[in-house]
């Protein structure tokens, strides 16, 4: 798999003298090669990447934000229901992503048998709190109370024991500098 301006297929073509066979397209490629050639293949792919001198590729790693919100005041059931009218989501019609640029971590709780999930309570500048959940979260999602963060999320409705609450499906969280 690839991302950004790096073409996986072009990288495979740059190593065509090392591989047995291969092919693909810009976003993904596959190869067959001898086990003893794995190191050579890895070096060639890295050399090819370096030769491109790509810059600012990090922008492709962050979720795109369809809407920036200043606070959580409009994150409610009505918003979630209106967003649901845009379904079905999928390729060509991605689910909208919201971004709050400044929020404080009020609490953090590890969940799951191995603590692999995280639940963050984020407070906006007006004191409103929204619970955010991420399943199989990377370690950088486990922020400490008091941390100031930017968060990318998708609003959802959680129904538990007959109680409906709006929360966020946390896609990414970054510590503010």
Residue ranges and their predicted role:
Residues 1-177:
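Acidic, two-metal ion nucleic-acid-processing modules in DNA metabolism proteins
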């Amino acid at each position: 798999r690839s991302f950004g301006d790096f073409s996986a297929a072009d990288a495979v073509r740059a190593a065509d003298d090392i591989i047995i066979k291969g092919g693909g397209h810009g976003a993904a490629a596959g190869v067959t090669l001898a086990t003893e050639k794995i190191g050579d293949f890895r070096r060639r792919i890295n050399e090819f990447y370096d030769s491109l001198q790509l810059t600012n590729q990090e922008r492709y790693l962050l979720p795109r934000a369809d809407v920036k919100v200043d606070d959580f005041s409009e994150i409610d059931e009505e918003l979630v229901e209106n967003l649901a009218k845009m379904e079905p989501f999928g390729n060509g019609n991605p689910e909208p992503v919201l971004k709050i640029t400044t929020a404080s971590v009020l609490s953090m709780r590890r969940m799951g048998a191995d603590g692999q999930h995280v639940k963050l309570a984020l407070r906006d500048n007006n004191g409103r709190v929204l619970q955010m959940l991420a399943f199989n979260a990377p370690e950088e999602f486990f922020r400490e109370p008091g941390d100031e963060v930017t968060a990318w999320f998708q609003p959802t409705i959680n129904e538990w024991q007959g109680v409906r609450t709006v929360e966020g499906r946390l896609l990414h969280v970054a510590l503010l500098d």
